[in-house]
Amino acid sequence: MYKRQGYRYFDTFGKEVSYPFGHGLSYTAFDYAVENAKMDADRCELKVSVKNIGKVAGREAVQLYVKAPNGGLDKPAKELKAFGKTALLQPGESQTLILTWNVMDMASFNEKNSSWELAKGEYQWMVAASSADVRCTAVQRVTKARKQKVHDAMRAQVPVAVYPMVKR
């Protein structure tokens, strides 16, 4: 299912790692809070407030992971869908980041049907400092499953003309 590498494998199968994906060191600390989460037919948007609660100035890389409902197709425990970085925040200062991504970025590929499929159900949007350090979450519901059919890249889309061999 997954190669034995990367946060998707390690998180899905509960393997411990020395440094989780997205891990970074800082001389300060940050607090996260979801301000707003919304999803329309095409786009997802999450507003997150990041506040420097430490004693020195610093920047923070904010990561957004999505946990999809079990729609019958294999999925990792969570997948990175968006990220952003704050400006240099002084102690006590905060900034709101707006993270956006396409709704179909949350879909799974169905090899049998050659289609991207967005399962119906609850999607957990996890705001994190790394793949192992989730700070806050929001939940959005997909009320109707969606499929986006694609074609086989190796299959000719129109019949290929057959040319007779030429003798030289």
Regions found by a protein language model. Give the residues of each.
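Secreted, periplasmic, or luminal enzymes acting at the cell surface/secretory milieu
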Residues: 3-59, 65-67, 120, 124-128, ...
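Hydrophobic beta-strand core residues of beta-sandwich domains
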Residues: 38-39, 87-91, 118
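Intrinsic-disorder/low-complexity, polar/charged segments enriched in Ser/Thr/Lys/Arg/Asp/Glu/Gln
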Residues: 43-45, 94-98, 135
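Short coil/turn motifs at secondary-structure junctions
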Residues: 53-55, 69-71, 104-106, 130-132
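Short, hydrophobic/aromatic beta-strand segments
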Residues: 57-64, 76, 109-112, 136
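Intrinsically disordered, low-complexity Pro/Gly/Ser/Thr-rich segments with frequent PxxP/GP/PP motifs
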Residues: 72-111
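Short, surface-exposed ligand- or partner-binding patches at beta-edge/loop junctions that are enriched
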Residues: 100-131
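Short beta-strand elements
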Residues: 133-149
